Amino acid sequence: FNGLDDKVKIINDEIKNYANYSLKNKVDVVYCNPPYSKKESAIIGDNESRNIARLELTTNLGEVVDVASGLLKPNGVFYMVHDAKRLQEIMAKLSLCKLAVKELTFIKGKEQDCPHLIFIKAVKCGKEECKIHLPIVLNGENGELSDAVKCLYSKKSI
C-alpha cells in the first residue's frame, strides 16, 4: 500500500457483518459495487454466486447506502458504481442517509450508446454541489478497449 500499511485497513466481508468491526463513524472511504438488479426484475439462474453478485438477494440498495453512511465519518467519501437506470432511486437514498453527491460519471459501452452505468462519489454531510464528468466510453469502434479505459487500467489519469 505504498508505505501506508499501518494506515490502510481493507475489509472484504459481507455487508451483514459490518457491525463486527466497531467502525461506526470512523471510516474515511467506502468503495462498493453492489448488485444492480432488484430480485423481482430479473431472471434467477443456476449459478448462486453470480445471482448474489448481480441481484439484490442478500442485500439491497437501501442497506448498502445506510451501512456506508453509518461507517463513514463526517466528510468521509463513498464511491459506488451502479445501474444508471436507478439513478433517481440512488440519489434519493443517498440524500436520505446524509450523503451528498459530489461527482457523477456516466459509463457507456460505445460512443453512440446511452450510458448504462454510473460512477458516484458522495460525501457524508457534504454540501450541495455536484460535478458531472464527461462519460467514460468502454470500447472503441473496433471493440477494443477505449484509450480512457486503457489509461485507467494502466493507472494513468484521464
Briefly describe each language-model feature range.
Residues 114-158:
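SAM/dcSAM-binding transferase cores
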Residues 57-108, 113-115, 119:
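Conserved Class I SAM-dependent methyltransferase catalytic core
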Residues 28, 34-63:
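Mobile active-site "lid"/loop adjacent to the S-adenosyl-L-methionine
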Residues 17, 36, 124:
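Short, glycine/acidic-enriched loop or turn micro-motifs at the edges of active sites
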Residues 1-28:
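S-adenosyl-L-methionine
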Residues 24, 42-45, 91-94:
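Short amphipathic alpha-helical segments
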Residues 19, 40, 88:
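Glycine/Thr-rich phosphate-binding loops of Rossmann-like dinucleotide-binding domains
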